């Protein structure tokens, strides 16, 4: 079975906790704080692998978590960073945030990587909090939790040439004759329900990858037939070979079929309508093909190269393969492949925090304050006092008062709730 969609959960490693330790050594009076920092959590990284062809591995395992950072220790020993978790995906995989639909990465080249969940920062040890007013702090930060999210993975095959056309036009038979691909072939519509890849080798030593795309029908751009499931696989190809049932053996008109298929490609993605293509006038061994070939040449011969072929007998396939190979030499290798895309680092201007009231609870939002809260050891009185100073310094307390907070009201910051005391 061919799997070209998957949904997975990824979580970066949590940062290690900072350490509270005091230096106690002979001949070292007033040793002072000596607690080391926690290590950073590992990142979750997706890496494109040209040797993979489907997303089937994600059918059996959907949750991935990187290693957390080690905790800090005494003697100012910092914890080791967590190891990154590298997940291999097929080249051509598009990565999106499942919740927002945001495009995170488009991994199109072998070895290309994208960080999809960053590890949390390690907490600072008590040695970091020495001030002239507090020479012996007995508090440390907890490690920051790693990023977590659900991802939608979508594979768009990477092939040089795409075979397109109506069902039963002979695409699968053609690819089986010019390559070692062995797709299922039968005389009923939609025999091919998954894309097939084959390497076509030319006598002069050149080769290219050909993809047999399941048959398209009118309305495919709206999802009719196999529609959206496989139209996206055509997007990566550099050249299209339009396979037509020239004999009209299925009761269709090849001249009209060509128009319909090209219209569907353009409606799905306008760039596909401009993609270079040649016509493989197939089934020339059947009655009626010669007459329709003449009509095709009259209608499209001035704009497209037309090759009379028979995938069954092999007629004309050598000339088609040689010409396709020559055309690929003229088309840049990356012409249909987008520039490598990875989630950019965005610095958003705006307020450091927000304050609002919902159902009697005061909600404080903001990445900075939420990080301070989650990294504070709320069981440590000294750490809580530091958090209160941060809240006042950021202006959050003043904003809460302006919002009408009273003694005993509940304040929620991230996943934590506090009681406001004047």
Curated annotation (Swiss-Prot):
Concerning SUPFAM superfamilies, the annotation shows: Obg GTP-binding protein C-terminal domain, Obg GTP-binding protein N-terminal domain, P-loop containing nucleoside triphosphate hydrolases
Q: Which residues form the OCT domain?
A: 337-422
Cofactors, names only: Mg(2+)
- Keyword terms of this UniProt record: Cytoplasm, GTP-binding, Hydrolase, Magnesium, Metal-binding, Nucleotide-binding
User: What is a single cellular component term in the Gene Ontology annotation?
Assistant: cytoplasm
Q: Which Pfam families match?
A: DUF1967, GTP1_OBG, MMR_HSR1
* Location(s) in or outside the cell: Cytoplasm
Give the GO molecular function terms. Answer: GTP binding; GTPase activity; magnesium ion binding
- Name its GO BP terms in alphabetical order: ribosome biogenesis
Q: For GTP, which residues are the binding ones?
A: 165-172, 190-194, 212-215, 282-285, 310-312
Tell me which residues make up the OBG-type G domain: 159-329
EC number(s) given by UniProt:
3.6.5.-
Describe the location of the Obg domain by residue ranges.
1-158
Which InterPro entries does the entry link to? Answer: G_OBG (IPR031167), GTP-bd (IPR006073), GTP-bd_Obg/CgtA (IPR014100), GTP-bd_prot_GTP1/OBG_C_sf (IPR036346), GTP1-OBG_CS (IPR006074), GTP1_OBG_dom (IPR006169), GTP1_OBG_dom_sf (IPR036726), OBG_GTPase (IPR045086)
The organism's superkingdom is given as Bacteria
What is known about its subunit structure? Monomer.
What's this protein's function? An essential GTPase which binds GTP, GDP and possibly (p)ppGpp with moderate affinity, with high nucleotide exchange rates and a fairly low GTP hydrolysis rate. Plays a role in control of the cell cycle, stress response, ribosome biogenesis and in those bacteria that undergo differentiation, in morphogenesis control.
Q: Which family does it belong to?
A: Belongs to the TRAFAC class OBG-HflX-like GTPase superfamily. OBG GTPase family.
Report the protein name in the record: GTPase Obg
Organism per entry: Pelotomaculum thermopropionicum (strain DSM 13744 / JCM 10971 / SI)
Which gene codes for it?
Answer: obg
């Amino acid at each position: 079975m061919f799997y070209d969609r998957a949904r997975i959960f990824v979580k970066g490693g949590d940062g290690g906790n900072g350490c509270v330790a005091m230096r106690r050594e002979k001949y070292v009076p007033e040793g002072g704080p000596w607690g080391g920092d926690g290590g950073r959590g590992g990142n979750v990284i997706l890496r494109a692998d040209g040797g993979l062809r489907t997303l089937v591995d994600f059918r059996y395992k959907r949750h991935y978590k990187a290693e957390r950072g080690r905790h800090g220790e005494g003697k100012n020993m910092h914890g080791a960073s967590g190891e990154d978790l590298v997940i291999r995906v097929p080249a051509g995989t598009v990565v999106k945030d499942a919740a927002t639909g945001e495009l995170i990465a488009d991994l199109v080249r072998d070895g290309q990587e994208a960080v999809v969940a960053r590890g949390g920062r390690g907490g600072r040890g008590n040695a970091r909090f020495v001030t002239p007013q507090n020479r012996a702090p007995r508090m440390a930060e907890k490690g920051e939790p790693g990023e977590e999210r659900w991802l939608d993975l979508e594979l768009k095959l990477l092939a040089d040439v795409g075979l397109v056309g109506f069902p039963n036009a002979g695409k699968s038979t053609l690819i089986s004759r010019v390559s070692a691909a062995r797709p299922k072939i039968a005389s009923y519509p939609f025999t091919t329900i998954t894309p097939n890849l084959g390497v076509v080798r030319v006598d002069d030593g050149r080769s290219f990858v050909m993809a047999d795309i399941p048959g398209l029908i009118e309305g495919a751009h709206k999802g009719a037939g196999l529609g959206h499931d496989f139209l996206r696989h055509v997007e990566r190809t550099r050249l299209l070979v339009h396979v037509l049932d020239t004999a009209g053996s299925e009761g269709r008109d090849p001249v009209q079929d060509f128009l319909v298929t090209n219209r569907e490609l353009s409606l799905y993605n306008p760039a596909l309508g401009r993609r270079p293509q040649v016509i493989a006038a197939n089934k020339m061994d059947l009655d009626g093909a010669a007459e329709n070939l003449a009509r095709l040449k009259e209608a499209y011969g001035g704009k497209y190269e037309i090759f009379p072929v028979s995938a069954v007998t092999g007629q004309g396939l050598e000339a088609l393969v040689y010409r396709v190979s020559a055309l690929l030499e003229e088309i840049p290798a990356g012409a249909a492949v987008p520039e490598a895309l990875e989630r950019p680092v965005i610095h958003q201007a705006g307020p450091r925090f927000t304050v609002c009231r919902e159902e009697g609870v005061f909600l404080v939002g903001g990445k900075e304050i939420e990080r301070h809260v989650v990294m504070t050891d709320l069981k440590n009185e000294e750490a809580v006092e530091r958090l209160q100073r941060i809240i006042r310094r950021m202006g959050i307390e003043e904003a809460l008062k302006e919002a009408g907070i009273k003694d005993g009201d509940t304040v929620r910051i991230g996943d934590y709730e506090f009681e406001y005391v004047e």
